[in-house]
Amino acid sequence: MADDSNSAYPRVDYGAGTGAAFPDLERRVLEAWAADDTFRASIENRSGAAEFVFYDGPPFANGLPHYGHLLTGYVKDVIPRFQTMRGKRVDRRFGWDCHGLPAEIEAEKQLGITDKSQIDAMGLAEFNAACKSSVLRYTGEWRDYVTRQARWVDFDNDYKTLDLDFMESVMWAFKSLYDKGLIYQGFRVLPYSWYEQTPLSNQETRLDDAYKMRQDPAVTVDMVLSVPGEHPLRELDGANALIWTTTPWTLPSNLAIAVHPDVRYVHLRAADGTRYVLAAERVSHYSREFGEDATVLAEFEGAALVGLSYRPPFDFFLGHPNAHRVLAADYVTTDSGTGVVHMAPAFGEEDMEVCSANDIELVQPLDPGGRFTSMVPPYEGLMVFDANPVIIKDLKAAGKLLRHETIEHSYPHSWRSGQPLIYMAVPSWFVAVTKFRDRMVELNKQITWVPEHIRDGQFGKWLEGARDWNISRNRYWGSPIPVWVSDDPAYPRVDVYGSLEELERDFGVRPTDLHRPAIDQLTRPNPDDPTGRSMMRRVPEVLDCWFESGSMPYAQVHYPFENKEWFDSHFPGDFIVEYNGQTRGWFYTLHVLATALFDSPAFKTVAAHGIVLGDDGLKMSKSKGNYPDVNEVFDRDGSDAMRWFLMSSPILRGGNLIVTERGIREGVSHALRPLWNAWTFLQLYASKPGEWRTDSTHVLDRYILAKLAQTRDGMTEALEVYDIAGACEELRTFADALTNWYVRRSRSRFWSEDRDAVDTLHTVLEVATRLAAPLLPLISEVIWRGLTGGRSVHLADWPAAADLPADPELVSTMDEVRTVCSTVLSLRKAKNLRVRLPLAEVTIAAPDAERLAPYADIVADEVNVKKVDLTTDVAVHGRFELAVNARAAGPRLGKDVQRVIKAVKAGDWTESADGVVSAAGITLLPEEYTQRLVAAEPESTAALPGNAGLVVLDSVVTEELEAEGWARDLVRELQETRKSLGLDVSDRIHVVLEVPEARRSWAQTHRDLIAGEILATSLEFGTAGEPAAELAGGVRASVRKA
């Protein structure tokens, strides 16, 4: 053909040309989808079909999306696209997480609020209005971002956790749990955010970045023992029990000290005469303080100390009932500290349990903001961390401080504000997870985890140790805890509500807003109070926002008030995906609530991917600039390139991924460019449209069709088990075979417009773009529509196995041919023998070499040799070497492993016909050794991958071979000259060559080769007219169109 205008393609033109940049093409596709409403059509096309239920975890919309959202979003698009093409209906409702601390923190920033008291002064209505306006601040940016990544979601039918219907379903869930006896109010020590003035759940302290390195003071403090005269250890009277703590601020609240009953303790006299009591194992740790002349006076078990009294370091709570005694506690260790533990039950869970068991009620000298109250006058108003240095100073002044040091340790922080937490006893509402924990473990066995090890590992272990879940937050913006209690303890009553109808029944009004303060205004007289004076008032707490996101499967459809039949038949969901940290977050809360409410898993399959890291291997940071800007990548390389980079990576198998610009660009070369090049090649040479055909008898056509059939099966199998990276590898391997083998080796057939070749490539591209559609949705759309003229590849069906002829034997053999050629070409490169220089011979030595006989001509042409010699006698050209893996073999063979190693080094080993290896009379297992095929002449020989055989290259260059190589080099230069003159690849030309005397005979000998390759109708040797191209070696060429 003369030019692109004669081409049969594209049938649908995006107006960008074959040389367009991928980002430009992508934008045109996105515009076409929007105009055509293609996404909606993909749903409607499957009306009445079996449904694939996908849960889209709701992000917070008051922050901008990042790489983590991008990665997860691509997975959330690949699987639904694939399932849609497989004939399923896949609704994809987008959701928004609207409640909780993220919204409140954003509102506080906007309003200039730095303290909770300012919210009370402002009024809850105004503050929550600000929260509501902030939560959907970035929905427009999210929509643009999601659209640009070519992710199809339903924004118009989205769900929001602040919607009345959603909140009513959450209320129903709470009431259902309460009715099952799985909700209770308790007073427990919990992770507490003094900054946000609310407790957190234990799983929230296990989220990524919850623990950070922090420096804190550590003090060793004296507590003087008081021992009655009749006690067996009366000599301890006046001795100092030593405690060690990293929270000096808890010392004013000390109510007990604890020892381990079975640990050995000592009474010693320091060099200065002061007497101390501590664990024997910890004495050496304080040798500097005790002095060289310290003397152990007595040694005894901790049990002997139990019951003794002592004087606390501060006297704020002297006389507290049953306090200031030595208690026994099995959790006391001697790994650090002194082996004597200071106990402030308001600030330690284990402290609280032990003190409670010994009838010691806690004292709470902190306000909700973590500041000391008037119960400890010297420190009143000080925040706990600010109080540390003041307390330490007072201890030192009182002579009670033995040691003061600074330690750096991993410490929990609020996952939202980033402020360090404290542990504090607070009243909270709990889901009694421990009552059904074993059932959660059982139901987890029904879930398919990707990667599989998370099921019994990270998630399974977490379930086994699951604790009751604190679901209440002392905050403002969230779903209310639907509990009303009497305001007079003389007439106690508790009412729990599970629907708007129930609220309307008791309060006479149907709420239109369940948020505070509107819901708090619902009050009524206490029916159990005959005086009529007490009122039923709602408890002030709101629900943990994780309770809401864990409720999304049913709350998004307003279950059980609507869509009950639909939900019952579509639960559990088929698939969810998030990063693996959600084993402590969304995955966990979904599983807890589904188990408790429905005795079922919430999902059948879950993919838990790794973390995206910056190009330095560290967490992505704007300030460090250690990652490429997403929008810049979209503009430079395109969304498909980014999608390929992320989807083909180990991150989808649980590993982490370092994002680099180079890695993203490799996605272009690995997948996009090969498919695009094959498509532009077809456009260039097909003057008539190709047809769907799979009956060509040409070996290359048969091979590529069979290779495609194999790829179809491999990709189908991979995507069915959510192995997206595996599907990418299948497609990458095929794209390489298509462009670097089939198209390149078929060029001459296309030049003559061989219909078998055109039809085969048309068919291959039509199927390949359907296979690539979920992984490369934008470029696949351009190619498929240009090829077929159809509406969208995403409305097409996934290729069926019966569509393509399978021939695994041909694929295997041809792939071996390709491997042989690649090995020979690598050998040529190592010896600096350019491919255009013909060589005499290559020998292929392999046990199955004869199967390559029908393809010897292909090998010869590909590697440019005159002859291909096939032999099964590998031993002539090389030998196998064995290496023993001592680490693997040692546990089984014991001392014999050295005897085996010695025998192998001496060459005393054998391999039977069925592949069993023995050495020194001992059979080795496959994992206990490695074999390597070693060439007898390494300079001219290379081993095939997998020790499959050897290739031996005759590298002797005769003058005849050199002459032909020179001619082929000349052809390449003349082709470049044609190109520089703007000639079409099919244009015929007249050429005059001016060749130096030394090379004239070579030119004459290879006249036909030169003329044929450059499409010269006439080729003359003489003086080249002007203008003439200056070529290598003094050759000049005059070229004009025939």
From Swiss-Prot:
Record-listed E.C. numbers: 6.1.1.5
GO biological process: any one? isoleucyl-tRNA aminoacylation
Q: Which PROSITE patterns match?
A: AA_TRNA_LIGASE_I
Entry's localization field? Cytoplasm
Instruction: List, alphabetically, the GO terms of the cellular component aspect.
Output: cytoplasm
Name the cofactor(s): Zn(2+)
Q: Keyword Cytoplasm on this protein?
A: yes
Question: Where is the motif named 'HIGH' region mapped on this chain?
Answer: 59-69
Q: Which residues bind ATP?
A: 622
The broad enzyme category this protein falls into is ligase
Disulfide bonds listed in the record: none
Lineage, top-rank taxon, reads Bacteria
Which UniProt keyword terms apply here?
A: Aminoacyl-tRNA synthetase, ATP-binding, Cytoplasm, Ligase, Metal-binding, Nucleotide-binding, Protein biosynthesis, Zinc
Q: Which InterPro entries match?
A: aa-tRNA-synth_I_CS, aa-tRNA-synth_Ia, Anticodon_Ile_ABEc, Ile-tRNA-ligase, Ile-tRNA-ligase_type2, M/V/L/I-tRNA-synth_anticd-bd, Rossmann-like_a/b/a_fold, tRNAsynth_Ia_anticodon-bd
Q: Which reaction does it catalyse?
A: tRNA(Ile) + L-isoleucine + ATP = L-isoleucyl-tRNA(Ile) + AMP + diphosphate
Coiled coil where? none
Question: Does this UniProt record's set of keywords contain Signal?
Answer: no
Functionally, this protein is described as follows: Catalyzes the attachment of isoleucine to tRNA(Ile). As IleRS can inadvertently accommodate and process structurally similar amino acids such as valine, to avoid such errors it has two additional distinct tRNA(Ile)-dependent editing activities. One activity is designated as 'pretransfer' editing and involves the hydrolysis of activated Val-AMP. The other activity is designated 'posttransfer' editing and involves deacylation of mischarged Val-tRNA(Ile).
- Report the family membership: Belongs to the class-I aminoacyl-tRNA synthetase family. IleS type 2 subfamily.
Q: How does it assemble?
A: Monomer.
* Name of the molecule in the record: Isoleucine--tRNA ligase
Q: What is the lineage of its organism?
A: Bacteria, Bacillati, Actinomycetota, Actinomycetes, Mycobacteriales
